[in-house]
């Protein structure tokens, strides 16, 4: 993608970021939930939620199974941990508890550390059902949340209005989703993401790979494209990433994606208008917040991966990336007060 095109879309993504302002109260700059954390996996929900906090969210909640929660609570006092996915509780008790927590969130990230056992998959399905009925709830799906989508694709389909959902599959997860939806995965790689997004009800997809392909299956509106661009139904992020493929990098992506989706959605609702950041006047921008969030998060995640690899080489682990989120955020999006690059909307 030409640098002019990349700069234009990134400036639009930057426009979603709320200012740091004394008139904003705690929680208005992002209340993010991560549904995951099971008997076998406690690291992934930590990386996703702490990545979201380091990226700029005000609050991060982890919704998990009790044994995972006991461990996650020791990782950081900054996280709010809800151990409500208890296999000893009834489905209705879990639904009620989940509804109470989710009603406080802007975005729910489903999948980090979720696992594939029947109980945790059932909890994820309940969360999808609740989110679909919450008009202002955004959803990001990763890891074993995608396993549920593969087996029950209807959980991400038929959302009212503009689908407020972003999927972040890696190569194998993407192939399995294509198989489920009967899409020939041997076609041109830039055509597959739009096909899958269309089949899944126009959910936005980040198809992770050597470059990241982003699509909701629809034509990209001209407002998102530079003058030199041809008509297309996908965006491609070619920003260089790191060479170390370490477990947990996708959790950093899901966290940053969730924050940008929350910021963009609140921007459109006018939450930041009283601090000099009015909602976009262009309807095409307002209707493509998930696409812009995906593009900004992909650019950020590839950059933090590159910086981590440059610093640590083969020894790089995801904990190194969490520590670098703040500085790479400023590299990609600018420091507070250095926002002259916002898109003109």
UniProtKB/Swiss-Prot annotation:
Its main location: cytoplasm. One of its GO terms (molecular function) is ATP binding. ATP binds at residues 208-212, 241-250. InterPro entries: CARKD, Ribokinase-like. Its EC number is 4.2.1.93. Pfam families: Carb_kinase. It is found in: Cytoplasm. Its cofactor is Mg(2+). The keyword RNA-binding does not apply. Signal peptide: none annotated. GO terms for biological process: metabolite repair; nicotinamide nucleotide metabolic process. Residues 9-332 form the YjeF C-terminal domain. It catalyses: (6S)-NADHX + ATP = ADP + phosphate + NADH + H(+); (6S)-NADPHX + ATP = ADP + phosphate + NADPH + H(+). Catalyzes the dehydration of the S-form of NAD(P)HX at the expense of ATP, which is converted to ADP. Together with NAD(P)HX epimerase, which catalyzes the epimerization of the S- and R-forms, the enzyme allows the repair of both epimers of NAD(P)HX, a damaged form of NAD(P)H that is a result of enzymatic or heat-dependent hydration. Belongs to the NnrD/CARKD family. PANTHER family: ATP-DEPENDENT (S)-NAD(P)H-HYDRATE DEHYDRATASE, ATP-DEPENDENT (S)-NAD(P)H-HYDRATE DEHYDRATASE FAMILY MEMBER. This is ATP-dependent (S)-NAD(P)H-hydrate dehydratase. It comes from Cryptococcus neoformans var. neoformans serotype D (strain JEC21 / ATCC MYA-565) (Filobasidiella neoformans). The lineage of its organism: Eukaryota, Fungi, Dikarya, Basidiomycota, Agaricomycotina.
């Amino acid at each position: 993608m030409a640098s002019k095109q990349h700069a234009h879309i990134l400036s639009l993504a930057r426009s979603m970021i709320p200012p740091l302002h004394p008139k904003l109260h705690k929680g208005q700059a992002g209340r993010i939930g991560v549904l995951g954390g099971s008997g076998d996996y406690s690291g992934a929900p930590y990386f996703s939620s702490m990545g979201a906090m380091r990226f700029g969210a005000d609050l991060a909640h982890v919704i998990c199974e009790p044994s995972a929660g006991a461990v996650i609570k020791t990782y950081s006092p900054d996280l709010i941990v809800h151990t409500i996915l208890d296999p000893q509780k009834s489905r209705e008790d879990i639904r009620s508890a989940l509804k109470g927590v989710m009603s406080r969130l802007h975005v729910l990230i489903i999948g980090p550390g979720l696992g594939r056992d029947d109980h945790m998959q059932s909890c994820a399905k309940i969360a999808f059902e609740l989110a679909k009925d919450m008009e202002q709830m955004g959803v990001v799906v990763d890891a074993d949340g995608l396993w549920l989508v593969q087996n029950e694709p209807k959980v991400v389909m038929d959302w009212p209005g503009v689908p407020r959902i972003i999927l972040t599959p890696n190569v194998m997860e993407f192939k399995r989703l294509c198989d489920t939806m009967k899409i020939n995965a041997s076609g041109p790689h830039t055509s597959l993401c739009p096909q899958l997004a269309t089949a899944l009800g126009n959910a936005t997809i980040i198809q992770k790979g050597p470059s990241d392909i982003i699509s909701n299956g629809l034509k990209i509106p001209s407002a998102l494209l530079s003058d030199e661009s041809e008509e297309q139904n996908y965006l491609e992020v070619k920003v260089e990433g790191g060479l170390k493929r370490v477990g947990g990098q996708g959790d950093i992506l899901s966290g940053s994606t969730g924050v940008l989706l929350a910021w963009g959605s609140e921007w459109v609702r006018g939450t930041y208008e009283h601090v000099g950041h009015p909602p976009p006047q262009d309807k095409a921008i307002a209707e493509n917040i998930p696409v812009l969030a995906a593009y900004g998060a992909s650019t950020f995640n590839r950059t933090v991966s590159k910086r981590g690899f440059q610093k640590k080489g083969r020894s790089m682990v995801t904990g190194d990336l969490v520590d670098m989120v703040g500085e790479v955020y400023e590299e990609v999006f600018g420091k507070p007060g250095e926002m002259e690059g916002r898109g003109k909307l």
